Structure formats: C-alpha cells, structure tokens
A protein has these predicted regions:
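Hydrophobic ligand-binding cavity/cleft-lining segments
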Residues: 1-49, 127, 131
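Short, cysteine-centered beta-strand-loop-beta hairpins and adjacent loop/turn segments enriched
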Residues: 59-63, 112
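Short Gly/Pro-enriched turn/cap motifs at secondary-structure boundaries
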Residues: 5-6, 57, 82-84
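Beta-strand/loop substructures that line and gate deep hydrophobic ligand-binding cavities in soluble
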Residues: 68-71, 77-135, 139
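Short, hydrophobic/aromatic-rich segments at coil-to-beta transitions
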Residues: 46-53, 72-80
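Short, surface-exposed coil-to-beta transition loops
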Residues: 10-12, 62-66, 87-91
C-alpha cells in the first residue's frame, strides 16, 4: 500500500472463519449487508453492478458517498475505493484454510480515523467471523 499521501494510514488484519470459502465469499459480496459487521456503515445501496452509495457515521460525523468495486474475482478477492468526499480503498482476500475454514485478509487505506484504523479493521473482521459462523447480525 502506498503511504505517500499526507494523512493516509493503512491497516491489514487476518482472521480464520469456520465456514467454507463459498459461504464466506458469498456473505462478504452481499455489499448491502456490510453494515451488519461494519458498524459505522448505516446503509449501503446498489447503484449498478460496480457502484454503491453508502451512509456512514464515524466518530459522530455523518458522511454520504459512493464506492466503486474496482476488482472482483469470485471466491478470491474484492477490491474497492471511494469516489467521493475523502479517500478510502480496500481489498479483501479469501483463501481456503481447509475444507471448512477460510482465511480472510482485509487491507484498508484511509484518511478517515487514521489513529484507530488497525483496531477498527480487526473489529470488523471479528464481527464478520461471528456473523458467518453464527449466521446472525451484529448490532
């Protein structure tokens, strides 16, 4: 990840989810469900196959924007970036750990909330793991 932009921070975390690669990828690729495990997201709505609008609230600051799916390799990788109001990009990788376990690696680069980015990425992955393994929404 390039850290040349001022105020930019990057974080990477990994989690092993006790579910098949297909189940894990399918859950993450339901972009409208991202708020179930990423609490600052209040809503995500599909615009077209590659663009989504979002509403977020991070540290009491509400934001609206659009993110673009720049790469989607089914069962392997999803990459995105925001195209409005600030900058954030990310990529999530899916690797089979065994027949019933999947390794999920999330990398994010952002100008939003840099001091806490690594902790937040870890929290989001933990929420995602619980969502998939328990098939329940995270408040």
């Amino acid at each position: 990840m390039d850290s040349a932009q001022p105020g930019m921070n990057a974080a990477q975390q990994l989690v092993v989810v006790n579910a098949s690669l297909e189940r894990v990828y399918e859950q993450w690729s339901r972009f409208e469900d991202l708020p179930k495990f990423i609490p600052p997201l209040r809503g995500v709505r599909r615009i077209d196959d590659a663009h989504f609008s979002y509403i977020s609230n991070l540290n009491g600051e509400g934001k609206k924007g659009i993110f673009h799916i720049v790469l989607q390799i089914p069962g392997r990788r999803i990459a995105w970036r925001t195209i409005s109001d600030g900058f954030m990009s990310g990529v999530v990788f899916f690797e089979p750990h065994s027949e019933k376990k999947t390794e999920v690696t999330l990398k994010i680069r952002s100008i939003f909330d840099p001091p806490n980015l690594s902790r937040r990425v870890e929290e989001y992955l933990g929420n995602f793991k619980r969502l998939v393994e328990n098939e329940e929404a995270i408040p």
